[in-house]
From Swiss-Prot:
Keywords: Oxidoreductase, Pyridoxal phosphate. It is an enzyme of class 1 (oxidoreductase). The glycine cleavage system is composed of four proteins: P, T, L and H. It comes from Bordetella pertussis (strain Tohama I / ATCC BAA-589 / NCTC 13251). This is Glycine dehydrogenase (decarboxylating). One of its GO terms (molecular function) is glycine binding. It catalyses: N(6)-[(R)-lipoyl]-L-lysyl-[glycine-cleavage complex H protein] + glycine + H(+) = N(6)-[(R)-S(8)-aminomethyldihydrolipoyl]-L-lysyl-[glycine-cleavage complex H protein] + CO2. CDD domains: GDC-P. InterPro entries: GcvP, GDC-P_C, GDC-P_N, GDC_P, PyrdxlP-dep_Trfase, PyrdxlP-dep_Trfase_major, PyrdxlP-dep_Trfase_small. Belongs to the GcvP family.
Length: 954
């Protein structure tokens, strides 16, 4: 048996890969006297923090989890009928255990290397097929951040696709209030004129329309004529919809919607106090090249077999930068996978049965309430009833509180109730009893629900089947499902199998102890709009984590609301804009961005209403100070901000960072420091104290939230005191913004993806101040060890003082293209044959590989990677010497599948053994890529973004 963790902290050496002895060996190899001496050589003295962080000492796993149990127990789990876009759901246990709690799924990276990502790509294709099927539209993306931001993205997509020259976007007053607020925030930054009103009274001249279908308060409208009227004036029609309702009501694509958005939360993903949940978007084919987010498409591999990949990547922010259609990067892949698997598990009959049950229970409730004399305002319904309760409203709410039931309070005289799949007949009777008590009437027995669609007008009832692809009817038993999930997981490479040395991505350990609390009911089953009196545990968690992150970064205030790093950037830039406007300087709308910046930086600046001016990099990859000063002079009084990444995307600590900050401040601008590389600074430097005004953090990098195959993420925005009033506004329990708020919300839930905040909270508690600093030091040690060991085989493109790198290094493989024809992509694909995920390709410099090992990888794994890279260099040398063919070699043909190697005939210029087992250790533990190299061009020329017919895989 494995021993339980001791009462003292033994977590730090479990998180940090190299042992003390290994660290000593590595320090000798790189020529550093000690870890402290190494940090002195790497980090500029002007920004080096000497004092330890004011954080508690490290604690044991047992102690931390017990303390978190105490915090969680402060939350009160009520039976929720609030609805408003968030609904109770049953997560299939087979999905809970084998996906959400399985590191093969949650530790994977975004599937930019498709050959080793076929499992989650297939799961995402299921999700896309499900969304397109239920919405009746041509194409769906692979998830957005939440329903509110998906609606905001629909607005910007409508503006790009509309034939109208109007600046007006019309939003129905029947949308959820939090959606209205998020859309309003986005519209203000982009200069879009928002008109909110009742669509039944006609439309103004506008470029787009946003409807809610069904309405927030329950009505199910026939929008066919409205869509025709909108199209007649050149407007694009978007609607926010509900996937479960679409099992029974007419798909938006059939009545004329061009875009459908919403949340897949009720397909098996708990409340989590607001997230994470997968937002979705589907649209007509005409808009596909402007659609935000990632898109899984079908292509073929080098052997002609079907293979999946991310399609149309040239439209993404990391390529188009300030011309991007969106700043969406990390989305909600893990949650989208769960939602798609929910549909596979239940199948078309099961999903429809759930929808029919919810609708019939709602009808039974309506009849019972009418019998009590409650006026139901909506004559049509799926799952929600709007109730005019008048003067009895406070008494009903008090009775509900006594029964531990949450109702939605619309205003002082109206309530609403929303049902979901978790509601039982006993629950419904208790709900009716609450209304009877509040009205001072005798309890009435609930009549048996009738299998009827009376609440849905005949004109908008869905005709025809749902989820018609065979994949949704392929699972008959849990045995089937278990094996299907195992088959998918076995196709992929994640951190549970290998190091993922992606530069700028920080693929570190996501410890089991950190993950355990996210499924606790006290965290998972809390509605985001539950009364504050029911969420003191969450508020203690949020306040504690906020204080810790401020201490770590040196900032004065923070918002945990942004649910991705890109949203954190956006929120920080909105704060800067609002600050300048409050100071009477609205003309400050230019953002300076170095040429090497992350692609999200210019995309976020554009969304915040800023003009982007690019600053050159010098020969060493640093910000060119002369060009920076020239750009500052060029834009003059229009300067709003400079965005820099630190340490730089070139993997070095720029010596002149304080000088850069001073130059911007002297010109009246603010400094935005991208915190994507914070893993190199925790405990050794605090950006809030060396000149930066605002940063976002990636809790899914530095603070151990797993990447989930492309989300979830959390991107808190931290600021100095003068920007604190301009952090994202927090919505109240009704989903409305305080009129005094200076900036609107950037996420639909008040605290974003609060359900995964226990992960960084536990990480910080387990590591303590000393452990966090040591993690940074070892991350830098590991990167310098790799750079030192590989420098004789591949040039390291950039280095700082003393020839050191920060937490990552760039290997320059560009010369090999000329000498051998081998590219960075060829090396990346060949690494798959060695059992590795590739480093980051062609960023920030085209044709290079950027390696970030993180502190969690031990010396043995580093040596395995180094061995692979050296062996690959020897294989390239064989091509250079003419020993191997320039076009037919192990690199150009990589990766090699078992199918390729077991073919009866072998016509290649190298032996099968070299292809399969280039190093001896692979004979013990070999990963086999399920497909050969994927043909990217074919996939974009022949775009298919839904599941193929089964016979295609024969």
């Amino acid at each position: 048996m494995s021993r339980a963790p001791d009462t003292h902290s033994d977590f730090i050496p479990r998180h940090i890969g190299p042992s003390d002895e290994d660290q000593a060996t590595m320090l000798v190899a790189i020529g550093a006297a000690s870890l402290d001496a190494l940090i002195d050589e790497v980090v500029p003295p002007r920004i080096r923090s000497r004092a330890p962080l004011a954080l508690p000492a490290a604690r044991s796993e047992t102690d931390v989890l017990q303390d978190l149990k105490r915090i969680a127990a402060r939350n009160q789990i009520y039976r929720n009928y609030i609805g408003q876009g968030y609904y109770g759901t049953h997560t299939p246990n087979v999905v809970l255990r084998n996906v959400l709690e399985n590191p093969a799924w949650y530790t994977a990276y975004t599937p930019y290397q498709p050959e080793i990502s076929q499992g989650r790509l297939e799961a995402l294709l299921n999700y896309q097929t499900m969304v397109a099927d239920l919405t009746g539209l041509d194409i769906s993306n692979a998830s957005l951040l939440d329903e509110g931001t998906a609606a905001a993205e629909a607005m910007t997509l409508a503006r790009r696709g509309s034939r109208s020259s109007s600046p007006v976007f019309f939003v129905s007053q029947h949308c959820h209030p939090q959606t209205l607020e998020v859309v309003r925030t986005r519209a203000e930054g982009l200069g879009i004129e928002l008109v909110i009103g009742d669509e039944s009274r006609g439309l103004p001249e506008c470029f787009g329309v946003l409807l809610q279908y069904p309405h927030s308060l329950g009505g199910v409208a026939d929008y066919r004529e409205l869509a025709q009227a909108a199209h007649a004036q050149g407007a694009v029609v978007a609607c926010v919809t509900d996937l479960l309702a679409l099992a029974l009501i007419e798909p938006p694509g059939q009545w004329g919607a061009d875009i459908a958005v919403g949340s897949a939360q009720r397909f098996g993903v708990p409340f989590g106090f607001g997230g994470p949940h997968a937002g979705f978007m589907a649209c007509r084919d005409a808009y596909k090249r402007n659609m935000p987010g990632r898109l899984v498409g079908v292509s073929k591999d080098a052997q002609g077999n079907p293979a999946l990949r991310l399609a149309l990547q040239t439209r993404e922010q990391h390529i188009r930068r300030e011309k991007a259609t969106s700043n969406i990067c990390t989305a909600q892949v893990l949650l989208a996978v769960m939602a798609g698997l929910y549909a596979v598990w239940h199948g078309p009959r099961g999903v429809r049965r759930i929808a029919e049950r919810v609708q019939s229970l709602t009808g039974a409730l309506r009849a019972a309430l009418a019998g009590l004399g409650v006026k139901v305002a909506n004559d049509t319904w799926f799952d929600t009833l709007s109730l005019e309760t008048g003067a009895a409203t406070p008494a009903i709410l008090a009775a509900a509180d006594c029964a531990r039931i949450n109702l939605r309070q619309v205003d002082g005289a109206r309530l609403a109730v929303s049902l979901d799949e978790t509601v039982t007949l006993a629950d419904l009777q208790a709900l009716v009893n609450v209304f009877a008590a509040g009205l001072g009437k005798d309890e009435v027995a609930l009549a048996p629900p009738q299998a009827s669609l009376d609440g849905i007008p005949a004109a908008v009832r869905r005709q025809g089947p749902i989820l018609s692809h065979p994949v949704f009817s392929s699972v008959q038993s849990e045995t089937d499902m278990l094996r299907y999930l195992r088959k998918l997981a076995d196709k992929d490479l994640a951190l549970d199998r290998t190091m993922i040395p992606l530069g700028s991505c920080t693929m570190k350990l996501n410890a089991t102890a950190e993950m355990i609390p996210i499924t606790w009911p006290e965290f998972a089953l809390i509605h985001p709009f539950a009364p504050a009196s029911q969420t003191p545990g969450y508020r203690e968690l949020i306040e504690g984590l906020s204080a810790q992150l401020c201490e770590i970064t040196g900032y004065d205030g923070i918002s945990l609301q942004p649910n991705s790093g890109a949203q954190g950037e956006y929120a920080g830039l909105l704060a800067i804009r609002a600050y300048h406007q409050a100071n009477g300087q609205p003309q400050r709308n230019v953002c300076l961005i170095p040429a090497s910046a992350h692609g999200t930086n210019p995309a976020s600046a554009q969304l915040a209403g800023m003009d982007v001016v690019v600053v050159a990099s010098d020969a060493n990859g640093n910000v060119d100070l002369a060009d920076l000063r020239a750009r500052i002079a060029q834009v003059g009084e229009r300067l709003a901000a400079l965005m820099i990444t630190y340490p730089s995307t070139h993997g070095v600590f720029e010596e002149a960072v304080t000088e850069i900050c001073d130059a911007v401040h002297e010109a009246g601008g603010q400094v935005y420091l991208d915190g994507a590389n914070m893993n190199a600074m925790v405990g050794v430097a605090q950006p809030g104290k060396f000149g930066s005004d605002v940063s976002h953090l990636n809790l899914h990098k530095t603070f151990c939230i797993p990447h989930g195959g492309g989300g979830p993420g959390v991107g808190p925005v931290a600021v100095r005191a003068h920007l604190a009033p301009y952090l994202p506004g927090v919505l109240d329990a009704r989903g409305r913004l305080d009129p005094e708020a200076k900036v609107g919300p950037v996420s639909a839930a008040p605290y974003g993806s609060a359900g995964i905040l226990p992960i960084p909270y536990v990480y910080i508690a387990l590591m303590g101040a000393e452990g966090l600093r040591r993690a940074t030091e070892v991350a830098i040690l590991n990167a310098n060890y790799i750079a030192t060991r590989l420098r004789g085989h591949y040039p390291v493109l950039y280095a700082g003082r003393n020839g050191r790198v920060a937490h990552e290094c760039i290997l320059d493989v560009r010369p090999l293209k000329e000498t051998s024809g081998i590219s960075a992509e060829d090396i990346a694909k060949r690494l798959m044959d060695y059992g590795f995920h590739a480093p980051t390709m062609s960023f920030p410099v085209a044709g290079t590989l950027m390696v970030e090992p993180t502190e969690s990888e031990g010396l043995a794994e580093l040596e395995r990677f180094i061995e692979a890279m050296i062996a690959i260099r020897a294989e390239i040398a064989q091509v250079e010497s003419g020993e191997r063919d320039r076009d037919d070699n192990v690199l150009r043909n990589a990766p090699h599948t078992a199918q390729m190697l077991l073919a009866e005939e072998w016509h290649h210029d190298y032996p099968r053994q070299q292809a399969a087992y280039p190093v001896a250790s692979l004979r013990e533990n070999k990963y086999w890529p399920p497909v050969a190299r994927v043909d990217n061009a074919y996939g974009d020329r022949n775009l298919v973004c839904a599941c193929l017919p089964v016979e295609a895989y024969a």
